[in-house]
C-alpha cells in the first residue's frame, strides 16, 4: 500500500505525524514499513539519519530520500502495482507545496493523509490542497486528521470546516491533541506518553486501512515502548 502525508503548506505537523504513524505501524503491527522523504527540507530523513548515527535503539524501518530526478519509481507501472497490492507500507512524506512533479505520487497513493488545524491559514491551504487533488483527478482515499488540537479552545469555524471536509473524504473522529511530548519524537520508538497521544486517531486510521489490506497486529504490553 502507498500512504502519503501531504498538505499544501507546512506548519500543520505533517512530518511529525508521518514519523509518528510510521513508528506506530512498526510498533503495533507485523507489516513492514518503508519510508520515503519526498520533502525538499528532508526533515524525516534527517531525523532518521540522526537516530541511525546515535544508535541508541534498533531501527524500526529504513527511510530513503526520494529524488525525482534520479528515481523513476512512478514511471514503472509494474512496480507501482506491486507496491499498491502489497501489505507492506510505503509511506511518503510529501513537501508542503503544490507542484506538478508530485502529481504521480498523489495519483497513485492508496491513501492521502491530510493533517490540518482550524487556523485561517491552515483552513485555506487545506481547501486549496483538496482542490488540487481534484484537478489532477486523484482517486486516492483522502483522510483528514485534526492536528495539534486544543480541546480547551473553542474553534468558531470547526463545525463548518468539518462538514466541508467530510464531503471530500473521511474526517477522523479523534484528533491528535496538542502535546509537547510529540516534539521529542524520534524514528526508533514510541514511549507510552507518545502512544497515548496518537493511539485513538491512529487506531481509527488502521481500522480504515484494514478494510482493504491485511493488518497483522502484534500482541503488546502496555509498558512496552516499542
Regions flagged by a language model, labelled:
Residues 15-22, 126-127:
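Motif I (Walker A/P-loop) of helicase-class P-loop NTPases
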Amino acid at each position: 500500500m502507498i500512504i502519503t502525508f501531504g498538505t499544501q503548506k507546512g506548519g500543520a505537523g505533517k512530518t511529525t505525524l508521518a514519523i509518528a504513524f510510521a513508528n506506530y505501524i512498526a510498533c503495533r503491527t507485523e507489516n513492514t514499513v518503508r519510508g520515503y522523504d519526498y520533502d525538499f527540507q528532508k526533515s524525516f530523513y534527517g531525523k532518521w539519519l540522526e537516530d541511525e548515527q546515535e544508535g541508541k535503539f534498533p531501527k524500526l524501518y529504513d527511510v530513503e530520500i526520494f529524488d525525482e530526478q534520479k528515481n523513476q519509481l512512478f514511471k514503472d507501472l509494474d512496480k507501482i502495482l506491486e507496491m499498491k497490492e502489497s501489505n507492506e507500507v510505503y509511506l511518503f512524506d510529501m513537501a508542503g507545496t503544490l507542484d506538478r512533479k508530485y502529481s504521480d505520487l498523489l495519483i497513485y497513493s492508496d491513501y492521502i493523509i491530510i493533517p490540518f488545524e482550524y487556523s485561517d491559514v491552515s483552513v485555506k491551504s487545506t481547501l486549496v490542497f483538496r482542490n488540487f487533488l481534484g484537478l489532477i483527478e486523484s482517486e486516492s482515499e483522502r483522510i483528514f486528521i485534526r492536528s495539534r488540537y486544543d480541546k480547551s479552545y473553542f474553534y468558531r469555524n470547526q463545525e463548518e470546516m468539518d462538514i466541508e471536509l467530510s464531503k471530500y473524504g473521511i474526517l477522523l473522529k479523534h484528533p491528535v491533541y496538542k502535546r509537547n511530548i510529540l516534539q521529542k519524537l524520534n524514528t526508533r520508538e514510541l514511549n507510552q506518553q507518545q502512544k497515548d497521544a496518537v493511539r485513538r486517531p491512529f487506531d481509527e486510521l488502521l481500522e480504515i486501512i484494514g478494510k482493504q489490506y491485511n493488518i497483522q497486529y502484534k500482541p503488546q504490553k502496555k509498558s512496552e515502548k516499542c
